[in-house]
Amino acid sequence: MKPFQGITFCPTAINNEILAKKISKKIIKLGGIFSKDLTRQVNVLVVGSTTNTNKFKFAVKHRFDIIFIDIQAIDDIYQLWLSGENILPDSNTATMTGSTYEMLKILYRRFSFKYLHNFNIFIGRITDTNITSIDSLVRSIKKLGCSSYNYQNFVIKDTSSHNDDDDQGQNGQISIFVTDTLLGARVNAAIEQNIPIVHFKWILDCQKRSALLPYDPYYLLPNIKDLPYDSIGSNSCDCWDKINTTFPTNIDAQSSLQRQQSSSTLTPSLPKTSSLLNKFKPKGEKIWDKAMSLQQHSKTNFSVLGQSPLSINNKQEDLSDNSTLIFKNCAFIIHHIFPGNHRSILTKIVVQNGGKIETSYLSGIYDHSYYIIPSNKALDSFNDLPEIIDDNDGIVTEFFIERCLYYQKLLHPIDLWSKPFLSTIEFQVSSSSKLLHHEFSSSPFLNVTITGFSGVELLHLTKVLNLLKPMGINYVEYLNKSTDILLINLAALPSIPKTHPLWSNEFSDLFTQFCINNNNDDPGDNNRKDFQNNSILRNSMKRKIEYIKKFHSIPVVTPAFIFKLLSAASGENNEIFLNNIKWCIICPRGHKDDFKCKIKKPYYTSISSEKKYQNNDPKIDKTILLKRNNSSLSEHSMKDTKNELLQKIRETDSGRKKRSVSSSIMDVSSERQMPDTKRIKLESLPKNFVPKQIKRTTSWGTIMSENVPTEQPTAISNPEEIPRTEEVSHTQVTYGSIQDKKRTASLEKPMRRQTRNQTKELDS
């Protein structure tokens, strides 16, 4: 049975159509009915951005049987349902009163709308102390969601005028002055600032009605100063006599809801408890709630040691109920890199469960000693971690504390969930192009979806995947055509025998504890059987597997692939194949390289660790550095290696200096000296030597002439006939002297030179 079965929801002040569609889809998936109109069948009114709507005002005045919740409540319940939490009421209680009625009670007690969240309330003088007091009013407005209040000094945070509650539509704070007298300097100052003076009975009536009543005109002190106390605000609601102070449903409505469930099959869920509210939180929160035992109210959140504060709500569940202490005779060293509030939380958890907090690692004194570091910090960022040799001790993350609290026992030996998994963050995952679905998603990241997980494993796996997004692995909540890999819980597949290679490898402890607790035959132990008792999780996993087999063929692997990838990021082997039998359950057909994921490191991390010693000279002998990195050296050999390395560097530096000096000398000498080749001595020409005339084939004046001779004489007919002395002695082409040209011109017939103008006439 779904949690909202038989409950009708109606929205108000949700102007965003996209948001309204999302809310309606979630309500329908949870088994509820979504109605845009406020009809008689409506049980819950979902309030959006403001309470200044006709639906809200009508429901407050006339509908005593309606529960008011906000949008966030729908989102929180939907996330709980997806994660496999038991949000249905207890089976024994539901049998007597009806499951729908009990679900409405949970909505009323846990998720009622905090309608004073945008109010700035100043509490002045209270003359009638027999009815209430300032401390009592402060407690009341805090329960109603008001966080901005003052009863000592009159400080105006919102100087704008507030004549009525219509200003709620502006999403601004509403300032009011609560008192029962019009006398006093503070009251006069509030009147000058146009701040409404409201009788304190308005707060008490809002708490009784479980809704925001209009203070204008029913509670404005100038209007009702002469009225008796019982008559104040009597007209603000028409159903005072029908309101139940514990739950807004009368006997007739309760009977009607019971009849709706008469033919329904109720699902056993939570064990009987005096508080249904505390059972409505995710496992991660309930672990810390039990441990901390604080009285603090907060919204549902999956974070345990994350960014948001812890949500603690009930004092009745405490670790005093446990007969044994989880961390008895265990010592913990909390690294100083943890934030102060996280350190205090871890310290209190460890001490309350029998553990000891030490400042340094002590081996052999306690049964177990653990050094705790943050899960989101890489190991290569630490330089002060101790060297732990004892098998009973180890370096763990805060995941270890959470897992021990979740399973209510000390988990030994330490599994892969609890060990530091992030060795470095300086790497990128490059996947095969055939593995990525670029036609549906342009992202170069590897899109990963999970199924079959619940409880603390679900919490930790999502945290691990979110940490890997900068490295190229993108966690997506839903399975679709853009998904590249499906991570599945091996312990949720009972058809795979324990002798299979999926179980007989170094990653098997990822699923051992989950398998032990969900396969426990004890019928009374239902607290950890989230997957076994939740048909929604099992059906969801089956549907995802069927979808992959029929419509979207992608690899289905266990989280061992992720942990292998993380371990390979610090090693030399930088290629991981998805079709490995250690983690692959379903794999499409294809070549081995089609399922390859390559780990790429930056240059300064991909080269060996000897980079810190090298001086970028390629002639340095690196064998010493490689030996030092690849072998464990004694103290004596390390000194020898150091001296040998320094000697090599000195020799290289001196050799480089000699080469640089010699090269500079050669450069200077080469500039000053002439080439070493002998100059050829030019022979003097005889006095009566007359050079031959060289006839040019054409010139600028004869280029466009038609009388240019077609047969062009060759200046040199045979190169071999030129004397050697003439070839050597001349350095440029000689065209003859002026006298030779005159003598030649007198012997030949003069040729008339064609000009450009004559050429144009010929063309015409």
UniProtKB/Swiss-Prot annotation:
Residues 1-99, 129-220, 322-418 form the BRCT domain. The keyword Nucleus applies. InterPro entries: BRCT_dom, BRCT_dom_sf. GO terms for molecular function: DNA polymerase binding; protein kinase activator activity. GO terms for cellular component: DNA replication preinitiation complex; nucleus; replication fork. Its main location: nucleus. The keyword Repeat applies. Residues 739-751 have a biased composition (Basic and acidic residues). Keywords: Cell cycle, DNA replication, Nucleus, Repeat. Residues 651-675, 710-764 are annotated as: Disordered. It is found in: Nucleus. One of its GO terms (biological process) is DNA replication initiation. Present with 540 molecules/cell in log phase SD medium. Interacts with SLD2. This is DNA replication regulator DPB11.
